[in-house]
């Protein structure tokens, strides 16, 4: 059988139809999932290239396979570009995901049973920062810090107290649902007092850090991890950065052969393309627009009477606290989805509701900003979200209002470009 003369439509009509329908879905909804974005056609082209055929265990010039001359060039380009982007001395672009980037740092710096101090999941932390169901929560002695019960801001005094008490081997800064800036310098002060390692997980705010719109952790953290999608607008994957090249060598060994085998060279090439795009002046303008749009979205919801956690946002995330409204996050997210607005249910700090139900929703602006939305558009989006939430407060059957908002979404989204 000659596989080289058949395209996807000819080979697998079912998958081809799924992709077509997913393209239609992505093009026709207002995407407010904070961890999602739209990559450029150039990134898609690299990711779908024949580099997927090449095995390349090891690192450039130190491979376990022959024939790696071209993929070595691609990986070196990705490394040099991302080092320039974040102004750092070391980068590893091989992690398959942000979770595996975090695991590689743990494997490099920790032993099973070591104490780790990270943000609790319900306060906005990530599964891989020590949550009980995750490997990090099973292998290490985890102590969690939370946000202030009144302001919902990071409580640096509590972190310092817990660090003094428990003497962690590793302190983690980072989040999956926290709308304010992080003081990485303060984290480093705490770390130095107790002799710990400091890891900053910037998966959500990497684009803000790269463009100077958020304090960089590079001068302070022993290791910095990130995803390469979200605000970096690249392929789904992971990344590890550092200014400590000795720690970098430990991380290299931890990732391969410790954690992964062959890297995904088509993904690494796509990362390189995204990093090149991120080095262009217009990328900084994009990130600034992401932040401005998030502020507009938060303000429009506040105007309609909804509680925005911490009273606003410094980044791309808007967390809506629905406790006083008597609506669950799951109920709200499902109704919004039917109205053509995708987001996710999200726990609120000190939330007593099940994590499968939650008391809030998380909204984000990166994806629609990529499509060209400005502040005025996000004000309209905020009003649409509020309309749906208002309807849920009055009537569990929100179908008529969902259809009305869906019509408004369809009218608005057609004004903005998508893949041809």
UniProtKB/Swiss-Prot annotation:
Q: What UniProt keywords apply to this chain's record, in alphabetical order?
A: Amino-acid biosynthesis, Cytoplasm, One-carbon metabolism, Pyridoxal phosphate, Transferase
One annotated GO molecular function: pyridoxal phosphate binding
Q: Could you say which residues bind (6S)-5,6,7,8-tetrahydrofolate here?
A: 121, 125-127, 246, 354-356
Q: What Enzyme Commission number(s) appear in the record?
A: 2.1.2.1
**Where does this protein act, in terms of pathway?**
One-carbon metabolism; tetrahydrofolate interconversion; Amino-acid biosynthesis; glycine biosynthesis; glycine from L-serine: step 1/1
- Biological process, per Gene Ontology: glycine biosynthetic process from serine; tetrahydrofolate interconversion
The protein's assembly and partners: Homodimer.
- Family named by the database record: Belongs to the SHMT family.
Protein's name in the database: Serine hydroxymethyltransferase
Q: Which organism is it from?
A: Rickettsia massiliae (strain Mtu5)
* Gene label: glyA
């Amino acid at each position: 059988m000659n596989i080289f003369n058949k395209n996807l439509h000819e080979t697998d009509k079912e998958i081809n139809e799924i992709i077509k329908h997913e393209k239609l879905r992505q093009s026709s909804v207002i995407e407010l999932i904070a961890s999602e974005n739209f990559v450029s056609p150039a990134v898609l082209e690299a990711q779908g290239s024949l580099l997927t055929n090449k095995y390349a265990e090891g690192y450039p010039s130190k491979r376990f396979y022959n024939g790696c001359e071209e993929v070595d060039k691609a990986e070196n380009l990705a490394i040099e570009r991302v080092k320039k982007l974040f102004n750092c001395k070391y980068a590893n672009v091989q992690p398959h995901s942000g979770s595996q980037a975090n695991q590689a740092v743990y494997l490099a710096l920790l032993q099973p049973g070591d104490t780790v101090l990270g943000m609790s999941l319900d306060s906005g932390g990530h599964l891989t920062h020590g949550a009980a169901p995750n490997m990090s929560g099973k292998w290490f002695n985890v102590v969690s810090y939370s946000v202030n019960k009144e302001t919902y801001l990071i409580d640096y005094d509590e972190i310092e107290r817990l660090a003094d008490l428990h003497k962690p081997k590793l302190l983690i800064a980072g989040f999956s649902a926290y709308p304010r800036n992080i003081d990485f310098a303060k984290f480093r002060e705490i770390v130095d007092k107790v002799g710990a390692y400091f890891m900053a997980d910037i998966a959500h705010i990497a684009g803000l850090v790269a463009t100077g719109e958020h304090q960089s952790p590079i001068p302070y953290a022993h290791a910095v991890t990130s995803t390469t999608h979200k605000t970096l607008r690249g392929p789904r994957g992971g990344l590890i950065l550092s200014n400590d090249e000795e720690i970098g060598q430990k991380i290299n060994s931890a990732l391969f052969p410790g954690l992964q085998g062959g890297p995904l060279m088509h993904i690494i090439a796509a990362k390189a393309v995204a990093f090149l795009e991120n080095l262009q002046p217009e990328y900084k303008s994009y990130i600034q627009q992401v932040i401005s749009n998030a502020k507009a979205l938060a303000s429009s919801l506040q105007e309609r009477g909804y509680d925005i956690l911490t009273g606003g946002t410094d980044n791309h995330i808007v967390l809506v606290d629905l406790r006083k409204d008597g609506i669950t996050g799951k109920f709200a997210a499902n109704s919004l989805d039917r109205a053509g607005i995708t987001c996710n249910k999200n726990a609120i700090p000190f939330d007593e509701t099940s994590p499968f139900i939650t008391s809030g929703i998380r909204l984000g602006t990166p994806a629609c900003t990529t499509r060209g939305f400005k502040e005025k558009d996000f004000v309209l989006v905020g009003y649409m979200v509020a309309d749906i939430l208002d309807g849920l407060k009055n009537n569990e059957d929100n179908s008529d209002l969902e259809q009305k908002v869906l019509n408004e979404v369809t009218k608005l989204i057609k004004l903005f470009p998508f893949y041809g």
